[in-house]
C-alpha cells in the first residue's frame, strides 16, 4: 500500500511539473510559422487547458517562463494581461480583465517581474502590479500595487446578529409562515 501511495505522489509531482513546461512548449509552438505545427500545437494546447481546468490564451503576453509550483490547475489569465519575468503563480489564480466600458478598473492587469501570486488570488481590472510584489493567498486586487509591496487579506471579522445567535443556541428552525 505504501509503495502505491509513493508512486501516486511521484506521478502527481511529475505531472504538475510536466504540464507547466509542456504548457510553455505548446504556447510557443502555437505561434509557429509552419501551419501544421501551429495547428497541432493549438489543438494540444486546448486539450491541456481543458484537462487542467485552465484558461491561458496562447496570445497572452508573458515575458519569461513563469513558475507554476502546483501546475496550471485552475489558472485563468486574460488575453490582454501582461506578465513580467520570473513570476510565481500558484493554483486557482485569476488574472482577469474588466470589460465594463467606463468603469474605474477598465482594462487588463499588468504584472511586473519577480511577482509571487499566492493560491486563489484574484487580480482584476486594469491594475498595475509593480516589481518584487508578494500577493497572499485569496487576496482580491483591484487597485494598483507599488513595487516591493506585500498584499495580504484583512483580518477576518465575525458578524453575529442576536436573532441568529438565539436560533443557533436553541437549534430550532423557524416556520416559513
Regions found by a protein language model. Give the residues of each.
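Terminal amphipathic alpha-helical/low-complexity segments used for targeting or macromolecular assembly
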Residues: 1-53, 163-177
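Short, flexible active-site loops
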Residues: 27, 70-71
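A short beta-to-alpha transition loop/helix N-cap that caps and shapes the active-site region
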Residues: 158-162
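Left-handed beta-helix
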Residues: 52, 58, 63-65, 69-70, ...
Amino acid at each position: 500500500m505504501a509503495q502505491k501511495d509513493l508512486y501516486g505522489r511521484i506521478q502527481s509531482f511529475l505531472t504538475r511539473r510536466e504540464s507547466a513546461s509542456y504548457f510553455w512548449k505548446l504556447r510557443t509552438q502555437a505561434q509557429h510559422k509552419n501551419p501544421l505545427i501551429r495547428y497541432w500545437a493549438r489543438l494540444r494546447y486546448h486539450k491541456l487547458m481543458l484537462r487542467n481546468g485552465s484558461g491561458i490564451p496562447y496570445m497572452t503576453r508573458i515575458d519569461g517562463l513563469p513558475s507554476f509550483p502546483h501546475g496550471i490547475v485552475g489558472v485563468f489569465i486574460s488575453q490582454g494581461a501582461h506578465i513580467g519575468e520570473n513570476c510565481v503563480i500558484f493554483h486557482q489564480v485569476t488574472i482577469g480583465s474588466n470589460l465594463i466600458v467606463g468603469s474605474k478598473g477598465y482594462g487588463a492587469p499588468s504584472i511586473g517581474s519577480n511577482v509571487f501570486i499566492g493560491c486563489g488570488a484574484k487580480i482584476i481590472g486594469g491594475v498595475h502590479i509593480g516589481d518584487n510584489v508578494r500577493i497572499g493567498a485569496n487576496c482580491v486586487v483591484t487597485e494598483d500595487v507599488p513595487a516591493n509591496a506585500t498584499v495580504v487579506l484583512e483580518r477576518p471579522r465575525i458578524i453575529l446578529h442576536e436573532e441568529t445567535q438565539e436560533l443557533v443556541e436553541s437549534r430550532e428552525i423557524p416556520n416559513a409562515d
